[in-house]
Amino acid sequence: QCSSKKSADNAVVNATETPVPLGDPFILLHDGVYYAYGTHSNKGIEFYTSDDLLTWKYGGLALNKEDSWADRWFWAPEIYFVNGKFYMYYSADEHICVAVADSPTGPFVQDKKEPMIADEKCIDNSLFIDDNGTPYLSFVRFNDGNNIWIAELEKDLITIKKETMHPCLHVTQEWEKVWPRVNEGSYILKHNGIYYMSYSANSYESPFYGVGCATATDLMGTWTKYDENPLLQKPGKLVGVGHSAMFTDKAGKLRIVYHAHKDKDNIHPRAMYIGEVSFENVDGVDRMRISEEYITPKLVE
């Protein structure tokens, strides 16, 4: 099922087969439609739509920079549907922000024109709502490299409870030490009572950018990285693979979306790819696994 053979039935694919040009991609499934967002435009945050994950259409700007706190560096958007509203967590000018809309296509607007943390540069903010309804934000702080932290949010899903800020991950494993000191792009899910955090290490510019996993039994406790990390690095013909997020597809299958370099010689424009996530029971504990196989989404008119 990880091929684009079906796409020929649904649309005429260009002979050149244009990839979807998103870095730091995120996919939202809402009302039977897949929406993809990511880093690409200097005008804000773009979106693309698909019915089958294989062929995608450009939709325009979901967030225009006029509606944001900043006017440059629009990175790593993640969109969540909560209580009838769509919340976009994204970075702008190396600060973390939230914009809200009534539709997944926008317009997303940042009513309060200020970042979530005004006095500190941060990036890669990701929402996680626990079973009891408590919202959390994982994000990257720039202290001795890029490190992943977590904090509780107020019920407005925008205000960080600063007193709860807790460190999760920093560079510790050998595979992460290619260049420079980077743990970033976190995404948290809960499975059978365990919290799983996927994250990326090394610079996104490095061919050795890759995805690892860490687990915890308490979000505010100790996060333990897998010894077998990275779970994804240079799959198939891809290099520079990372900044991932997970989602459940229409068939109920857990998927992972990530970007890779344009090719082995050029980083940009980065392109979006989609793999599968599974859990393997090892000594009574479910271990996350990421497929080496991947879908190559195609852009159609």
What residue spans do the PLM features occupy?
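Carbohydrate-active catalytic/glycan-binding domains of CAZyme proteins
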Residues: 2-301
